[in-house]
């Protein structure tokens, strides 16, 4: 991205001319607040309105590798319209989306100040959260949120997500920005605790993880057209297990480089020799007996209607994207239910001169 374009984007942000969000165009009657006090943050489907106030400019501009934490107040309203204000410490996080040349807004990490937490707060179960800010347009946030919802259907050992409508108030300059459509993500420790597990931080090979969950995860990544992951480097993967004796389960996250999301910056690594992220490539390890996939294929077939309905029923996506995505899903189901194409696609890691064993390292230096 050219420097002049970066400057233009920054000026647009701080003069309040960020493109109008998809959410702002939706009739609020279709998104009821609900009784937020009777459920946790991720038990609700409605878009949550929040306001972040503090030295927002310094927070968003601090994109160094060792970014500092900045005090930020998080405001939202309960069902009775009572405003709740919580103290937090926020900092930029991530790799690709953290860079100015890639995204207008960087992803944020939220740490709640426990001494300030109210018992009735919607966030009382949270100590940390990830906040995905809109990178280039709100519609891609919505698309990625739907991908998290797909994986939630596959297994509870998955990260939960909730859309949030964000207003930014810079208390130093008195400028406000928004609304922006973002996404709150469940923190790793909470996800692990919810499933009676703990994080596993040692490096493993794919074959050393739980076979059933790995196949479900790898086929899911194939479904969404995502190749930006690896077990070996924990690239967009977290590992969890009940104890040191249990085989680890791989949990995927960060799907913005998938074909089903279709972000404008998403490109497959050149080593995979793919034309675009819309071209699928199965990236599991070599399995020659296709019967080993039977249980996984049965699972995806059982979930087919539910997966399709996520897109059919979603009022936040436009009709063009809905139709193209349903067609993309049709291609997936045609593949897994045809023995010949299944063997060709899922047997790719066994191909001697193929790229099936390429390990995605991402932006890591180790």
Regions found by a protein language model. Name each.
Residues 23-366:
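Phosphate/dinucleotide-binding and metal-coordinating scaffold of catalytic cores
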Residues 1-26:
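Bacterial Sec-dependent N-terminal signal peptides
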